[in-house]
Amino acid sequence: MTKQTEYKRKPEWLKIKLNTNENYTGLKKMMRSKNLHTVCEEAKCPNIHECWAVRKTATFMILGAVCTRACRFCAVKTGLPTELDLQEPERVADSVVQMGLKHVVITAVARDDLKDGGAAVFAETVRAVRRKNPFTSIEVLPSDMGGVEENLKMLMDAKPDILNHNIETVRRLSDRVRARAKYDRSLEFLRRAKEMQPDIPTKSSIMVGLGETREDLIEAMDDLRANNVDILTLGQYLQPSKKHLPVLKYYPPAEFAELKEIALSKGFSHCEAGPLVRSSYHADEQVRSAKENTAEAK
């Protein structure tokens, strides 16, 4: 048995019960009727049934459903993106009202075809949601937008409640996992975001199971803390298709618990770690915890 086939069968802790109720079907119909996309669907998130059916939350994916990059872990379509939909910010804001969300996550495909990386539409979406939902906290999860400081500033000036940007993997594996994104550029993006808006919590996420070592993960944690990242999420990488990178290890829950303790000892204000944890998983609880810790620090 080869190393690649050794881990084909998912362990018991990754088997989930699909809970499809009227909340789930209702949200799906609403998204289609408003021509909106969610990363929950496009990235084949394993938590979609819990979030949609039980928690009634969703992560909106703006700027279209086609990404200009082809990261080897990601299920989102790659190709030539469609034209910008300038009405999308208002539709997202209306959907947040209709869903009654207390916390919303807004992410996007990478738009390297645009000079601003999609920052203008991203910022307008934040403002539109804020106008119509003044009591809803807003988390943004952008690409690095080409590493252009002006693009990041445009987004940060819209004053989201939390800035999330994922390094996805450890330094040693970064070029293989996401060739068109750079590890150090992502760290710089996170550092600049904190410098621009010191009171806005920053967050990043790492997938495990791609061949990283414990030492690699500790190095990544140290890199994030050195750039003042507040929140860390750690989750199991799951291969979307045979075309994507294989899973080399399934981490048991106990190992995630150990990694969480290490992360908290490094100074992260909050760490969500577990086999099915994704960047937006329990995002409302993460931002609340970060703000409480920030208030205590003051």
From Swiss-Prot:
Species, as recorded: Bacillus cereus (strain AH187)
SMART domains, per database record: Elp3
Assigned EC number: 2.8.1.8
Pathway assignment: Protein modification; protein lipoylation via endogenous pathway; protein N(6)-(lipoyl)lysine from octanoyl-[acyl-carrier-protein]
Protein name from the UniProt record: Lipoyl synthase
Family that this chain belongs to: Belongs to the radical SAM superfamily. Lipoyl synthase family.
Single Gene Ontology MF annotation: lipoate synthase activity
Domain Radical SAM core: 53-269
Record HAMAP family: Lipoyl_synth (MF_00206)
UniProt remark on cofactor binding: Binds 2 [4Fe-4S] clusters per subunit. One cluster is coordinated with 3 cysteines and an exchangeable S-adenosyl-L-methionine.
Cofactor(s) needed for function: [4Fe-4S] cluster
Gene Ontology terms: cellular component: cytoplasm
InterPro entries on file: Aldolase_TIM, Elp3/MiaA/NifB-like_rSAM, LIAS_N, Lipoyl_synth, rSAM
Catalyzed reaction equations: [[Fe-S] cluster scaffold protein carrying a second [4Fe-4S](2+) cluster] + N(6)-octanoyl-L-lysyl-[protein] + 2 oxidized [2Fe-2S]-[ferredoxin] + 2 S-adenosyl-L-methionine + 4 H(+) = [[Fe-S] cluster scaffold protein] + N(6)-[(R)-dihydrolipoyl]-L-lysyl-[protein] + 4 Fe(3+) + 2 hydrogen sulfide + 2 5'-deoxyadenosine + 2 L-methionine + 2 reduced [2Fe-2S]-[ferredoxin]
Sites where the protein binds [4Fe-4S] cluster 2: 67, 71, 74
Keyword annotations from UniProtKB, A to Z: 4Fe-4S, Cytoplasm, Iron, Iron-sulfur, Metal-binding, S-adenosyl-L-methionine, Transferase
Residues that bind [4Fe-4S] cluster 1: 40, 45, 51, 280
Xref: NCBIfam families: lipA (TIGR00510), PRK05481.1 (NF004019), PRK12928.1 (NF009544)
Superkingdom classification of source: Bacteria
Compartment annotation: Cytoplasm
